[in-house]
């Protein structure tokens, strides 16, 4: 295969193919059952041959893994189970040696409840400067025994947890993920330090988690009537919890930091906001780019793709940025499966897939032959479009969702909240460790070393043998070969 030509321009990201790595499920170098940073470095040749311009790492920071690493204990370190800072530096060096950029996840809406600032907030008590870094409120009721507001978290269950002194703290996701108070200057400083830290370690850019939720108006007259479950459903920036205009003041600060570097650091927003508002995040004075998730939620229909493409290009033109295209990621059911399930008009395709997973893949027929054909066509469409394409680990192998993970082996907290227990199976089916070799002598399809002391953190199905990287690399008609050819042509 001819050498891949990658852009060295400062605006490389505008037309890049970015490969998302979920580190705990990519490759395990130690036999712990968890993927790690050295495992990524060991497969840099694979990523180089695939032809990607950049890799984006989901969180690899110290964490209790209450939410797959998105509960961050320390924003400026590596989880010791996944490696060391020296390992990270070696990975960046290996990537840069072959022209691959490195993007890391940053999680600014919430920390973990083990972060040093949250521990200090609990110790300092009511009204303290330490507690003001988070969103604490007194409860309702005669003795404050009721939460400040009847809010349901995005994962289900209450969005408030009570602490020993009687106050309650806000967590729009899991209880282990207390929300930062972005009206506090200490919080701004914490993240400025973090952006500079990773930039100084050679990181080329950042993916910003829940970018639309940082700023909240807790004094809004309508605060009691809203909920984290609402989502960003307004076009004027007036929702007390989401997509507020003030969030762009934060990103203007960040843009100044990005521009301190040569070339300037890049950022992309995960912002589930109305199409009319996406351009704000993608402006050159803001983060610079925003994900377009239209492909990830639509039925397989020509008009749906047409609408998604037009909307994505319109956002890019309005912002002066580039469009983005996403078929799968770590939060949604793999597109090969979505395209293999019945496409029922006037139905939420995502919900069809969620119900299918809940029933261990038995509620609908998964037509894998059809799903594969559609996935191949979707790839070629995606690669032909202007802008950036984000691909998720394993989609280049044509992996389907693993629907039948036993309940007692699930890890995703959204499967275990008081509301969702037994009703939603979560996101683990797209986070199963990758199959690298078809021979299963080590019990992990090459994900872990043959002498591994632990099994992979999520179980792999037997059918992974047919989708392993070594098998597909030798098959000119495989999904992997198609991805390599499409990325080279692009």
Where are the language model's segments positioned?
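Active-site and adjacent substrate-binding regions of carbohydrate-active enzymes
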Residues: 1-490
């Amino acid at each position: 295969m001819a050498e891949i030509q990658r852009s060295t321009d400062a605006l490389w990201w505008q037309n890049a193919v970015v490969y998302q790595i979920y580190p705990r499920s990519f490759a395990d170098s130690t036999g712990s059952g968890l993927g790690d940073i050295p495992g990524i470095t060991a497969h840099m040749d694979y990523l180089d041959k695939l032809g990607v311009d950049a890799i984006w790492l989901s969180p690899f920071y110290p964490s209790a893994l209450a939410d797959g690493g998105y509960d961050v204990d320390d924003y400026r370190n590596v989880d010791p189970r996944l490696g060391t800072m020296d390992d990270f530096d070696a990975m960046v060096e290996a990537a840069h040696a072959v022209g691959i950029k490195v993007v890391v996840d940053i999680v600014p809406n919430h920390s973990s409840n083990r972060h040093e600032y949250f521990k200090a907030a609990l110790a300092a008590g009511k009204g303290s400067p330490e507690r003001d870094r988070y969103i604490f409120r007194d409860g309702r009721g005669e003795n404050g025994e009721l939460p400040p507001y009847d809010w349901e978290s995005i994962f289900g269950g209450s969005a408030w947890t009570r602490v020993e002194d009687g106050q309650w703290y806000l967590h729009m996701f899991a209880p282990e993920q207390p929300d930062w108070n972005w009206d506090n200057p200490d919080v701004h400083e914490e993240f400025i330090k973090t952006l500079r830290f990773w930039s100084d370690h050679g990181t080329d850019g950042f993916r910003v988690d829940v970018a639309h939720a940082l700023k909240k108006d807790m004094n809004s007259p309508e605060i009691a009537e809203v909920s984290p479950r609402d989502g960003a459903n307004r076009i004027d920036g007036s929702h007390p919890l989401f997509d507020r205009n003030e969030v762009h003041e934060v990103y203007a600060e960040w843009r100044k930091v990005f521009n301190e570097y040569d070339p300037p650091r890049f950022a992309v927003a995960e912002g589930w906001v109305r199409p009319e508002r996406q351009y704000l995040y993608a402006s050159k004075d803001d983060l610079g780019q925003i994900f377009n998730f239209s492909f990830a939620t639509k039925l397989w229909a020509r008009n749906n793709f047409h609408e998604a493409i037009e909307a994505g290009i319109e956002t890019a033109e309005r912002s002066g940025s580039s469009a983005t295209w996403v078929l799968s990621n770590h939060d949604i059911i793999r597109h090969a499966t979505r395209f293999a399930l019945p496409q029922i008009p006037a139905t939420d395709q995502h919900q069809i897939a969620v119900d299918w997973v809940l029933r261990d893949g038995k509620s609908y027929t998964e037509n894998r032959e059809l799903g594969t054909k559609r996935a191949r066509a979707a790839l070629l469409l995606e690669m032909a479009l202007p802008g950036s394409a984000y691909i998720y680990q394993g989609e280049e192998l044509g992996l389907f969702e693993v629907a039948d993970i036993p309940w007692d082996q699930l890890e995703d907290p959204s499967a275990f909240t008081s509301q969702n227990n037994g009703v939603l199976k979560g996101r683990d089916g797209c986070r199963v460790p990758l199959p690298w070799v078809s021979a299963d002598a080590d019990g992990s399809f090459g994900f872990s070393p043959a002498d591994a002391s632990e099994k992979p953190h999520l179980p792999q199905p037997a059918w992974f043998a047919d989708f392993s990287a070594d098998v597909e690399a030798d098959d000119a008609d495989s999904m992997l070969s198609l991805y390599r050819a499409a990325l080279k042509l692009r």
